[in-house]
């Protein structure tokens, strides 16, 4: 039998009573299970009498195991019976007496109740998309940069030049001065082919530890193609005017996508900020762990451990700010997730089979696998979560459409 003793926000205190006959059956099952695994001198494995096994293991230890076993068995039944959706729980009281039932009290962090703000009255302050001629000209200039060629020049190296060098060890490699480390750039600027220069090598503290004798073999500069009909045709445009129109249309599509994404972001942030909810600490801690795991993965790709990164922040006196920012970001993400979930519950959009299949195909492309492989990897529960995400996406789009 289970009953709610006390409820305060997300925190629910629950009492569970297990009848004596079930306690007895669980104890006997526990003994049999242990007897099959515990070695008792003078008996073959699994053949020792239960009383002998009980004496060998000790009554107190067995009763502790029994309590844990009973909680594992009955807690899921209790929360289902009471209609709770726990995100965390801990047992705070236990009472197990000889020949009697087992009683325990658990403090449950229940999934929070959520109330949305009046989102239909939202005014989203997002600037409409705009594509200017200056933006078109800039995009065309970027195209010229992309199709530029490196050509040798007989002069001193300048800021954006590329140098081909050889070190005293015989290693030859190119250096882009625009991307070079400041001390390397400073050493090579103004040098020409045939010059020999001593390039400093710095340690992690920025201190010079040695110099490398380096010879400049060649200086090259970027030669941009002329913005003319010929250049347009290399990009499969019919004319220069056609190229400009294509660039303009591409920028408009990008601006429209950015506008829609900004509207959605502004809506969700506003929805989350106005959410009436008391979030269980365990949900926030779980999201903080999730964020740290992602950070650790990013750092690992850079050859840095999370521990070293946190230690460096501590040395700089920035660890507390990092932890505070982490908590704020975790809360923001949890609030947005709860807001999306509640909005989908409120609007209850339907996901057609056609929409679902299209979504699966898009997800498979993003993961670089076939749809059937995606289904197998995600499994039934993963696919259910994916479908719920699609349903929530639809709810957000419906809300944005209603706002106009």
From Swiss-Prot:
It holds the Pfam family Trigger_C. GO terms for cellular component: cytoplasm. The keyword Protein biosynthesis does not apply. It is an enzyme of class 5 (isomerase). The keyword Electron transport does not apply. It catalyses: [protein]-peptidylproline (omega=180) = [protein]-peptidylproline (omega=0). One of its GO terms (biological process) is 'de novo' cotranslational protein folding. GO terms for molecular function: peptidyl-prolyl cis-trans isomerase activity; protein folding chaperone; ribosome binding. Residues 160-225 form the PPIase FKBP-type domain. Its EC number is 5.2.1.8. Keywords: Cell cycle, Cell division, Chaperone, Cytoplasm, Isomerase, Rotamase. It comes from the Bacteria. It is found in: Cytoplasm. Involved in protein export. Acts as a chaperone by maintaining the newly synthesized protein in an open conformation. Functions as a peptidyl-prolyl cis-trans isomerase. PANTHER family: TRIGGER FACTOR CHAPERONE AND PEPTIDYL-PROLYL CIS/TRANS ISOMERASE, TRIGGER FACTOR-LIKE PROTEIN TIG, CHLOROPLASTIC. Consists of 3 domains; the N-terminus binds the ribosome, the middle domain has PPIase activity, while the C-terminus has intrinsic chaperone activity on its own. Belongs to the FKBP-type PPIase family. Tig subfamily. This is Trigger factor. The lineage of its organism: Bacteria, Thermotogati, Deinococcota, Deinococci, Thermales.
